[in-house]
Amino acid sequence: MNFFKIFIVIAITASSIAFAHSGVKDKNVKERMMLMKAMADNTKLIGQILKKQTPFELNEVKQALEKLSSLSLQTPTVFEVNATDPKSEAKQNIWDEFDEFTKLSNELAKNTSELANLVENIDDLRPTLMKVSEGCKACHSKYRE
């Protein structure tokens, strides 16, 4: 997957999440959406640094990756309640396959934490962002409308 495709996926995800929040009535769904928005924001920051729209600061990149790891670990918790809302993009199979959903989330947490320890300079960002995007896509392609 090339960088342009990754950036488009991030941009679409961030904009659809922001739009989706308006009018959400179920508190569980809103909590899930807020967590996903935080994940998108951290991923977007890395993309902006890679595109040189934001200056490279190693500590910021590491913090964004650690935050992604933490949010990934929280993801199964916010999906424990099978709550619905017309604005929700969560597919029913999340709860039908909750162990697999949790496994994918935990893998993303592990990978982003490892990446936070490996990234050293701006040249490391492209493969880092690709790895993060692959983890997001693994879950979204299966469990998101």
Task: Go through each PLM region and give its residues.
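Sec-dependent signal peptide recognition
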Residues: 2-10
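N-terminal signal peptide c-region/cleavage motif recognized by signal peptidases
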Residues: 15-20
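Sequence context surrounding c-type heme c attachment/ligation sites in exported
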Residues: 22, 26-145
